[in-house]
Structures are given as C-alpha cells and as structure tokens.
Curated annotation (Swiss-Prot):
Lineage: Eukaryota, Viridiplantae, Streptophyta, Embryophyta, Tracheophyta
PANTHER family (UniProt xref): CHLORIDE CHANNEL PROTEIN CLC-E (PTHR43427:SF6)
UniProt keyword Transmembrane helix present: yes
Record-given protein name: Chloride channel protein CLC-e
Gene: CLC-E
Superkingdom to which the source organism belongs: Eukaryota
Biased composition, class Basic and acidic residues, residue ranges: 502-511
Organism encoding this protein: Arabidopsis thaliana
C-alpha cells in the first residue's frame, strides 16, 4: 500500500479533486498501461492526460510514505514460537493450580470424579458440597472487583501504572478462573487457556513493538496454543484459530494479518502441545472408551443424534442469554450489586450437586464416568443421563451469567456426552432388544460411540467450530471410522444452530432499527462525531461496544496517522471559485478542502464553517458564488485558512490527536516530508471522525478476541 500513495500523488491534478483511492493488494495482479512523457511532464492512462509531478517529489513521497513496512518473517515466526512456549508453560501451571485447589477443597478425594458423592452418606458431606462452590464464588467476586478497579485508566496510556494494570487484569482473570474451577463450579478450563494465550500474544507483540498485523497474527497463534495445550491436540488448536479468529476477520478486512499467519499458528500450536505434554503427560484430556461401528446403516441414526445435539446446543445458548438478561435486570432494576451474583452462582451449584454431583467440575473425569470408562464405577441410566443434561445446562448458564470465570468447552463435552449416551442406550433398547421392532438384523453400535459423536456435535453447535470439533475427536480417537458419523452429526448440529442464530439476529436487528429509527434520523442531521459512530454501530453491529468499553478505548502507540487518515480529499487554489470549491467538497463527501498553489504546495485548509461565516458576514454586494473566490474568503477571515499545524503519515495517531485537541482543530492536513519544511505536499486529511472510528474498531477487535470464552 505504501507504494500506491506516490502513484496516486503522481496522478492527481493540483487543481482538481482527488479521484484515486489507494490500490489495495489482492490475489489477482492489477495491470494497466502507463505512458510516461519526460518531455511534456505528463502521464497518459486510458487516453486521459494527467500532470506529472517532478521526479524529486515522487522520490520524496516514496521515502516518506513507505513507513508501513511489515516486520521480517523470521522475527514473526520466532515470536509465534515464543508465544507457544509461554502459553504451554502457563497452561500447565494453570491446570496444576486448579488440581491443587481442588484437592485442597475436597481433602484429596481420589480421582474418581464426583461419583464418590453418590456413594458417600449425604449427611456427612452436604455442608462441604454447598460451602466449597459458594466460597469459590465469593473469592471470584472479590477478584472481579479488583479487576474492574484495575481496568480504570489514569488517562495516560503510556504511564507505568497503566502498564502494570494491563498486566494485572489478565492475571486476576486467570486466578478467578482457577478459583472457579478448583471449587467445582460448572464451567471449563479451555476458555481461560485461550485467554492466557491471547494475553501472552499481546505481551509479546507489545514487547517487540510490532505492527497491528503482527499483533493480530500472534493473537491467532496464542489462541491455537491455548487449545492445543489444553487438550494436547495441536491439529484441533490450529483449526480453532482458523475458525474463531482468522475466518471472521478475513470477511471484513483482508489486510488484518500477515501472509505467514498460518505458519505462525501451526508452530505456536505444536510448540504449546509439546510443552503441555512434557508438563501434564502424553495422555489426552479424557480417556476414549472402547467403541465400535457395526453398520453403515446407522448413519441416519447419527444424523438424528446431530439434530438432537443441535437442539441441546440451542437450549444452552438461549438459557445463558436469558439468565444474563435476568442478572442485568436484577442489577439495574432491583439494585442488587454485581458482587452478589458470583456467590449466588456458587451456592446454586452446591445445592444442585447435592442431588446431581456430576455437575461439579472435576476435570474430565466426570466425562469418563458418562462414557463408562472408569473401572469399578457403575454406569448411569438413560433417564439419569437426560436429567444431567437438563441440570448441567441450567448450572452452566447460571454460572456464566453470574460472573464466574470459565469456558464452554468442558460443559459442552459433558452435555453432549450425556445426551449421546442416553440416545445410544435408547436406540439400543428400541432396535436391538424390543420385540416390537423386527429389526434384529440391524446391528447398533455401543452407546459409547454415540456418546463420542454427541460430544463433538454439541461442541460444534455451542461454540460454532464444526471443523475443530471433528478434528478434536478424530485426533483423540485416532480412528478414521469415526469420521463419517462425526461429519454427519456435526454438520446437522451446526446447521440447526447457525440457522436459528441468523434468524434470531435478524429479529433483533429489525427490532433495534424499528425502536431507534427516529434517533437515527435525528443523528443523521447532527454533526457530532459520537452520533456518526453510533449510526455506524446501528448498521454494523460487529463494531458496537457498550459504553463502559467506549470510555476505556485507547490508541496504542504503534498506530500511525496513515492507518486512520483519508486518502481521498478535495484540493482548491486561491483562484478557485466558491461554487467550484463547494462542488469538490460535495464530490468527496468532506467538509473541508486543502488549499494548494500551482506547484501543489500546501497553503491551508478551507472548511464549510469558513464559508458559512463568510456568507453571514458579507452584507453588501450581489456577487454570485461563482464570482467569489477562495482568496476572498481567506483574506476576509484574517488568514484563518492558514493552519500552522500539520502532521505526517508516520506520526503516532495519539500524538496527532493530542495536537488536534490542544489547538481545537477539527481537521488537520497530512503532509509528506518534514512538517517544518518550507515546501510540503498534502497526502491526506485527518479529522476527528477518522480517529474515532479507528479507535473504536481497534478496541472492538481486541475486545472480541481477548474476551474469547468458549
């Protein structure tokens, strides 16, 4: 892109409006024929003649505008490997801390999951079962309050205190997740693992002061490392980063990440998986039971299981949404403090665990119990499995809504495993043992096979990661026979959940537009920058943030003026008529025009406000707009058109914003070369709307990536 700016500068006329947008890099090479005439000083393109700037000017533009250089591939790859190592070590420490806290909370109960609570007398354990999750919720509530306090900025984004707070926030969140899971609350560790990887990626990128593209690629690598180290499944981690991070961003911005992002993701995932295997052992997250697939005729049964898991996934999503709305309503309408809800969440889990102890988080050992992999542990009946599906959905949704910290992967696998096992037992009973069905020739697989497929189908439906779900189960089972049933069930589940999600999103969008139509019309006539941004949020909901996040948006030091400035702008000369100046502003949809001389030397800025003030002050004369010139307006305004403050493309956007705020400027010209040079050429315009949109888009993207809880 850096090389396209001098081309645009060379093709523009100094007395006409800019008509050339930067040529963005695409997969298909852009070719056109250009005829240069050194004698006549012009460029011929498609039969049109454009004045050509001097060669010295072009070289200066190339030197000054070529600031957006991508970092070396070697440094990016090394950074991705470093992210993988640090993420693997951090996830190992995180899991060890969860296990230590769990053993401390339950006095070192053997690794049998929560099945021991069904065998132990309830009278001797009921108080502990209730108090342990409740105390965990209380500690998480305190940590959440500390994290909110650490989230308040001092106003200087580069102060040492703010940097300490930036490190403290993810640390406190990780500790809160450790307490949540160690005390048995119904969430999972994979979401915090992704958060750990994303936080480490941000830290590494900040340490080396790299570009935003590198930072985004490292975030994808960190997310892959988090999943890889959590499940000891590197392939699934890579596809998770592709499905959850890279594909959503590629639909909106093709230049967000680096060309070698795929290599960075793979190396980071493999490195983290190796470190995790060294620290936690080579065994997978949960033990795969013995299973078999007996007949291709079972495929319709797996499709039906996928539809069932899709409905279960929708139930979990809707239940979480409803409980989150209820918590917000209780907080706003009833005045219940947010700090109370994590305690209520832990208390609710403890009460449910008195009857259904399997809802407690106990690693993946409860999943082993569902799949009947644990020796000397009696399997659960089909009706009890269905009850566990219902109570696990309620417990997980309430924990998530109450403010407890954790992810959705482990609960989704538990719910899917329970649903699949129950389905398999019902199918086996109906088709193999019931004499009412004359289908004895149909061989039905064991319930464990349906349990494994149900886990993947529910995971795909809840988290919208179908490829990750398929590859995760395939990587854990290492059996190609499971792929065909997996693909069918996962595809059916994803289709059901994605269709419902789109319809729900469409309904919410229509309701929002109907409710705010009057506000939108009013805001269209307003010149306030915040109104313009809100209009954009109404159209593009992916850029929306709540008010608390908007207040904390900060511009990182690595963002340059070139990434926010407008490269299309209107230019006028002192001899340009007022009518022509207004026409050029209208063509470019801007409220200002840059004043240049015949040599394209920047002189000042003409704004609509200047024209309006001139019109109000001019009381005599009947001159028409075409008889009034820019020189008349600038002379009458006492030299107001001459703006002494300019910025360069390679200047920090934060510094440019400081200049505009200090001198109360709504627009500032972006010029090539040094701002102190006597002859400077304009290359862009920076206004407050550009800064606001850039700040909000960056903050939204970072918020969505760094709050990625599955």
């Amino acid at each position: 892109m850096a090389a396209t700016l001098p081309l645009c500068a060379a093709l523009r006329s100094p007395v006409s409006s800019r008509r050339f947008a930067p040529i963005h890099k695409t997969d298909v090479p852009f070719q056109f024929n250009v005829v240069l005439s050194p004698f006549f000083g012009s460029v011929a393109i498609g039969g049109r003649i454009f004045p050509r700037l001097p060669a010295a000017k072009q070289e200066t533009d190339q030197d000054e505008v070529g600031f957006d250089q991508q970092p070396s591939q070697e440094l990016a790859i090394a950074s991705a490997c470093l992210v993988g190592v640090l993420t693997g070590v951090s996830v190992v420490l995180f899991n060890n801390c969860v296990h230590l806290l769990r053993d401390f909370s339950w006095d070192g109960i053997p690794d049998r999951g929560a099945s021991w609570l069904r065998e132990a007398p309830i009278g001797s354990n009921w108080l502990r079962v209730i108090l342990v999750p409740t105390i965990g919720g209380l500690v998480v509530s305190i940590l959440n309050q500390l994290r909110e306090s650490a989230g308040k900025s001092t106003g200087d984004s580069h102060s040492s205190l703010d940097r300490v707070k930036a490190v403290l926030r993810p640390f406190l969140k990780t500790v809160a997740a450790c307490v949540t899971l160690g005390t048995g609350n119904s969430l999972g560790p994979e979401g915090p693992s992704v958060e750990i990887g994303a936080s480490i990626a941000k830290g590494v990128n900040s340490l080396f002061n790299k570009s935003p593209q590198t930072g985004f690629s490292l975030l994808a690598a960190g997310s892959a490392a988090g999943i890889s180290s959590g499940f000891n499944a590197a392939v699934a981690g890579c596809f998770f980063a592709v499905e959850s991070v890279l594909w959503p961003s590629s639909s909106t911005d093709s230049s967000t990440s680096l060309p070698n992002t795929t290599s960075m993701v793979i190396l980071s995932a493999v490195t983290a998986s190796v470190v995790s295997e060294i620290g936690l052992g080579s065994e997978p997250a949960f033990k795969v039971p013995d299973y078999d697939f007996r007949s291709p005729g079972e495929l319709p049964l797996y499709l039906l299981l996928g539809a069932l898991c899709g409905l279960v996934s929708l139930a979990l999503s809707r239940c979480t949404s409803s409980m989150t709305s209820a918590v917000d309503s209780l907080n706003k309408d009833a005045g219940i403090p947010k700090a109370v809800f994590p305690v209520m969440g832990g208390l609710s889990v403890g009460i449910i665990a008195l009857v259904y102890p399997e809802v407690l988080y106990w690693g993946f050992q409860n999943v082993d119990i569902l799949l009947e992999k644990r020796p000397f542990v009696k399997g659960l009946s089909a009706d009890l499995l269905l009850q566990l599906v219902a109570v696990k959905i309620a417990a997980t949704a309430w924990c998530r809504a109450s403010g407890l910290v954790g992810g959705y992967y482990a609960p989704s696998l538990f719910i899917g495993g329970a649903a699949g096992m129950a389905y398999g037992k019902f199918i086996g009973l109906a088709l193999a043992q019931n004499p009412d069905f004359n289908l004895s020739i149909l061989e039905v697989a064991s319930p464990q096979a349906y349990g494994l497929v149900g886990m993947a189908a529910t995971l795909a439906g809840v988290c919208q990661v179908p490829l990750t779900a398929v590859l995760l189960l395939f990587e854990l089972t290492q059996d190609y026979r499971i792929v065909l049933p997996l693909l069918g069930a996962v595809g059916m589940s994803s289709w059901i959940t994605s269709g419902q999600s789109k319809r729900q999103e469409t309904r919410e969008t229509k309701e929002t537009r109907k409710r705010k139509s009057q506000e939108a019309v009013q805001s269209l006539t307003s010149s306030d920058d915040e109104s313009s941004t809100n209009n954009l949020c109404e159209v593009e909901s992916s850029l929306c943030l709540d008010d608390s996040l908007n207040q904390s948006e900060e511009l990182p030091k690595s963002i340059f003026v070139s990434e926010a400035m407008r490269t299309r702008f209107a230019t006028v000369m002192m001899s340009t008529s007022l009518e022509e100046a207004l026409t050029r502003m209208l063509i470019e949809k801007q409220s200002c025009a840059l004043i240049v001389d015949p040599d394209n030397i920047f002189l000042g800025i003409l704004t609509l406000s200047d024209i309006q003030e001139f019109s109000k002050a001019r009381k005599e004369g009947n001159n028409r707009p075409k008889d009034i010139f820019v020189n008349d307006i600038c002379s009458r305004s006492g030299g107001k058109c001459k703006v002494p403050w300019t910025v360069t493309p390679d200047m920090d956007l934060l510094a440019a914003q400081t200049i505009m705020n200090k001198h109360e400027l709504s627009h500032v010209a972006v010029v090539s070369g040094s701002i102190d040079a006597p002859r400077i050429h304009p290359v862009g315009v920076l206004d407050r709307e550009c800064i606001t949109l850039t700040r909000r888009a960056l903050a939204t993207r970072m918020y969505l990536l760094n709050s990625l809880y599955l």
